Amino acid sequence: MIKFRLLLFVCGIYWSVGALAQQDPMFTNYHFNSLAFNPAYAGSNEHLTLNLSHRQQWLGLDGAPVTQALNAHSPLRNERVGIGFSLLNDKIGPGGTTDLAGSYAYRMQVGASKKLKLSLGLQASMANWRGNFSEITVEHSDDPSFSQNISRWLPNFGAGAYLYGEKYYLGLSCPRLLEHDLRKTNQDTEALFAKNYRNIYLSGGAAIPLRDDQLVFRPSFLLQSAGFLSNLKDRSSGQKIGAPTSVNLGAAFLIRQLIWTGASYRTALSGKSSHDSANLWMAWSLRNGMRFGAAYDITLSKIRKASSNSFEIMLGYEFDIKVKQVTSPRYF
């Protein structure tokens, strides 16, 4: 059983006090997981790509987030069209979400250059959200907020845009446009309620060759805003609920087209964030198409007093990688 005070401490990081206002899970190695937040990325690698990730947030903290993601995407015979598939499983405290999504992207050339492309993507998804509140030990067992478990099926759709060339990219997306009230309609209006938020993503980066393609410098950023254009407010204070807008600023080096090594800094642009961290990561791309990666996040917020740091592992496979490495190296 999860103790009530500890649970509120953990959930308050991802959710807001007075409500369970959920935001999307995060990945430090988001460069290899872009389909999870932008459907326009589907097919942009020019070949079938698979990626599996596992993230353990705040080691040693009971109820801390644990996330797994499986992504696959590929262009079709019509090179303008890409399709993708993603499966996400996220567990935090007494709640959990399993999300299945399919993506469709259409790409077009921009201007006279054949190297600059704009991809527009759509996504349809179905998620199962579970709130196992009976796991929580509370002082008053008759509290209606914790008297029953909840399971909801949540259909959704999303959209995104992805502008990219050989040496830079820029993306804007909202993978889940609809916001769902996760309470049952017959619940007491003053009881603890839950709602998932619309998340907006802005991403960008560049590849700067230092020694031809033998050493490439890649700066990048990912901005995430939860609750954008939302009117959800705390019922007691009347204040708007939502996680602060966060940004991940990173820099990486690609060595001999095989080894990635990088670092990033994650923080909030407004308000306080428990996600503040300094992150280190590496990835190895084998010539047979396999890719392995790992990331370690050093917690910088006050939560470091109650938990250890976070880690992430990744396994990927890219088909026909030998041909693509020779003709058109990919940096994003």
Regions found by a protein language model. Name each.
Residues 1, 21-22:
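Absolute protein N-terminus
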Residues 7-8, 27:
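Short helix-onset patch at the extreme N-terminus, typifying the N->h transition
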Residues 1-7:
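Bacterial N-terminal signal peptides that target proteins for export
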Residues 22-332:
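Subset of outer-membrane beta-barrel
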